[in-house]
Amino acid sequence: MCLQIRQSRFFESGLYVDSETLVEKARVFFSGREDSMNILISLGLVVLGFALLVKGADFFVDGASGIASRFGIPQLVIGLTIVAMGTSLPEAAVSITAAFKGSAGITIGNIVGSNILNVSIILGLASVIIPIAVQKSTVKYEMPFMMAVTLLLVLLGMDGKISRLDGAILWACFLLYLYYIYRMTKNGKEEQAADALPLAKSVLFVLLGAVGVVLGSDFAVDGASELARIFGMSERFIGLTIVALGTSLPELVTSVSAARKGNADIAIGNIVGSNLFNILFVVGTSSLIIPVPFNPRFIVDGLMALVVGLVLWFCVRKNYQLTRKHGIILLILYVFYFLYLCTF
């Protein structure tokens, strides 16, 4: 009788755990450890992917420029094609890879998010460090063209996808932009050709760069997609934030470094050019290869990119200078946009 009472008290105390409960607790415990491991692996893939993308793009541009110089291609043409496209190579690789993997949220989110980051965060930080002078041609022609192209992307995506025809339209605008840059550069002073790399070294750089970009984009997309799954986030959110920041690292490092060295006047031109390449070349190429679905929520994101561009243009349209006050305004704009992303 006493033994039965003790057993009853033991069961009621909660110290007793039957086999089914024990198995369930073990499953939850190891499931949590598995998710933690998946998070670490996914973060590692994203970081490694971005590192390979940035370094691979550098190698590819250096090698391709060296090969072009060895074959007598003018520096003007090299600058307009290889070097200019090189700044958008990480975005291009990630977006095209994501399109093939069916991750449309990353494909479009990466481009739109990068364009918003380039203006609000990168130019915002650079101008807080030191006021940035802006060329008149950038204010009068290139900024309005950037805003027009951003609006064009939104309009093309309103039917729910960026089709091959849409891609052809973007590429036609891209060729017009290249022609404009060619005419502008011919009217200016042509840069002297730097000492070209040896041909063998240039070929090696191209191969290493291509491998780095391909592997880096694959790792970054897989890692970002897995993080979205684990945390229950949309690929749109991941593409607009984490992936966009990672692929914008070259522009961030270049612009902030230029501002610290007193060469900030090149920052805005590079950012505007990069934003144009992102939409016209990257989205155009991605959609020519495979039509890209366009989430209706990207309309708001695209309009935000347009608003940021308008604010930038309004800040510099009179004095042709982006001041510290303007930089703070751009940074605050991104904070509000990020809060919107977290809410919706």
Residue spans for each PLM region:
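Hydrophobic alpha-helical segments, chiefly the membrane-spanning helices
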Residues: 9, 21-344
